[in-house]
């Protein structure tokens, strides 16, 4: 599965957990596909979070190339997990 499938996996498990961390990488190619996948995945994750009232840390990185992806992936998962924990601790 790719980043586009993350929302459906979260949706299927939404009642099992208090929060989620979505991790993935979308690297821009030569077609508009990147824009469609990036936006639709982000929108779906946000809607799941709002509708379920559960935090979903968005650790899906969008980059122009693999080099950027490697750099951004070093901290993005930790940041997304910390965001989820912060919401769970404060609400």
Language-model features and meaning:
Residues 8, 71, 86:
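Charged/polar, solvent-exposed surface patches and flexible loops
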Residues 5-44:
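Glycine-rich phosphate-binding loop
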Residues 64-75:
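Phosphate-binding/catalytic loops
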Residues 75-91:
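A charged, well-structured terminal subsegment
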Residues 1-4, 62:
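Short beta->alpha junction loops
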Residues 35-62:
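Short, acidic/small-residue loops that bind anionic groups at enzyme active sites
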Residues 15, 46, 50-54, 85-90:
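Generic secondary-structure signature for well-ordered alpha-helical cores
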Residues 22-26, 57-64:
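Glycine- and acidic-rich phosphate- and metal-coordinating loops
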